[in-house]
């Protein structure tokens, strides 16, 4: 429901606004409210939705104070927050709202004085106030001279809803959020802040004072303080010291297996995107942006999706040739089914095929083939059957349930799915572990299609690749890069000795996995049960709109990025980020010059490579050019009433886009991440580092934060990505992005000695009694350590040039210490034991705790600034250093 036009005054203003304190005034004002349009003080929900939603969770119990006849409570319900209780002083308006929203019994309405709330303790997670406290202050002479009675009244209400003086900021922590919007509370906060800012100006005028009292400094100091655990010595456990408070205040949200800064920022970005896509005045000249909204809205059509049920996938399976689990199937069509499943619909049974830059000739693209075909996150889940019995049973239950939902026979579905699972176990047996695939020189094999045919003769490769890359014409001499020759040879033998019915069941199972997320709630519910076992998620509370934002990001991510960038990105941030990268690059090269183990020839080549690293900040330029953006998605058709068909169209469109790349050179405009992504990456074949707009925000970066925090946040991320150019894999590529040996033998041997130290260091860390894999995480650990060192050296260089910064109030840290705390708090995280195990066996990164502890225990600068003695847990005595 819309509110009256902006700036329109309510029709019945009292002669004196102290009438706002009288219930009789409100009772009279709201006569007939059930039939009149709603009125929203300070604007309707849409005016602050993007700011509010990142602070809310769908399961929150929300209390709205002084609801009046506002549409806020109902719009919260429509926005995916169903647990809303609204109270008002006036019984007349409460009765009116109960009548107006009788069709929504979930909404609760109570007659109650906000000064005498009658709810049990801890009844609510969120309290919203928009204008009510202003009414309590009616009759004051002016907003700047509030009487002691007025202050007492506001204090009384804040106490009623749970604010505890001295223990939290006015806008609360997210553990039990009390969120007050507008009203006198914000006015009082603004007045207090104004006093602090004024005091800060005086401090700035007097150079003897070194405390920063700007609004930004006060806010960030509060966030840092509430994340710290002062009961722990920084030299005992710096992660707990930096994140203990954050962990206490951030219990794992329902439906999540992990929660950290990256998740929080992505939720925030999603809320902004939701606001943009659901804007009723959405009007874009870009066809790609219009497609984005149509795709998103089709995903939200839950009633239509439920109405269609499983039929869209059943029809697709029948079109391909049938499935032995659900009915008749064509027994002689292995190649045809493989082409449809892996080509048209982009699933990856047995292996994956893609087009990418040739590692040894990076200015050209080439067909690449690699191992694939497992549904569970890692081969370990299949092979360590005793430890993973619960997961394998849950997976088989999931397979059976989906087979039954699609028409499988009760008497045979589980037996046939067991055969598919056994085939996946055989695939896991021949799959090469990730920690044995880190030397790209060894796993890179370039050959012709005819040579590939001889290596893996169980299928017609020319026929398959020609179909996949249609309408391109291929011949037997077409080059292909194969990663893992032994795997392909063995998978070919496995195909030859497997019964056709099992092959068919496995191929269609891959298609089912790919498409069921587009089907009705029964399929989602089946998956939730598997995910609970696999990742420890207790229940799924992810609202549909968030799922749809993620789907839209996958399908039309750069068109979505265009909307995001235009709405949020500060162009000056790009210039500042580029300056920081330059400073960090300089610091890295200076450290390079001091390495005693590297010979001069290799050092010079390394410096040239560092100089040549190309940085991309924010977004690719083409997304702000409507015609160029439209061209990217030209040919992708969007149906307004079939989300399933939109996903099928996406797979088909993606296959055509891939084929189009083969005869073109790689382009720098082809980013691997969309602008709204909260992440960054280094691409060795382009020798480039990329920082999307999504990560260029607090706590990683903010223009008005101390430089210590910016260098400790986004600065370390920048140093991390730059160091990837010189980790155990990146160091194999030269400055042009080509995989070739450019190191002298002596320096290479020394490099391996230094990395062996780091590998062994991380091998010693444990999570829930399970050791980290120092080999699997080596590249990321090298980047973490090198990135921290480069960023800190860049910060010191900045200080030499600009002088010391003012310190944050109350935190009790020097700015050098603040740098390390800022770095650590970026990695504050909570995670289920099941998710922690999954990370240990699949993730090339170390767990968050050891990204902090491992890196800082190797940092002489950290140990010096915190005074950690040799023998303390943070200073074991031996430091592992590569860069």
From Swiss-Prot:
Q: What is its main location?
A: Golgi
Question: Organism, per UniProt?
Answer: Homo sapiens
What's this chain's function? Converts big endothelin-1 to endothelin-1. May also have methyltransferase activity. May play a role in amyloid-beta processing.
- What is the regulatory mechanism acting on its activity? Inhibited by phosphoramidon.
- Which gene is this protein's source? EEF1AKMT4-ECE2
Cellular location(s): Golgi apparatus membrane; Cytoplasmic vesicle, Secretory vesicle membrane
**Ranges for domain Peptidase M13:** 211-883
Q: Report the active site residues.
A: 721, 784 (proton donor)
The record, for PANTHER family, names: EEF1AKMT4-ECE2 READTHROUGH TRANSCRIPT PROTEIN-RELATED, ZINC METALLOPROTEASE FAMILY M13 NEPRILYSIN-RELATED
Residues passing through the membrane, by range:
179-199
Name by which UniProt lists this protein: EEF1AKMT4-ECE2 readthrough transcript protein
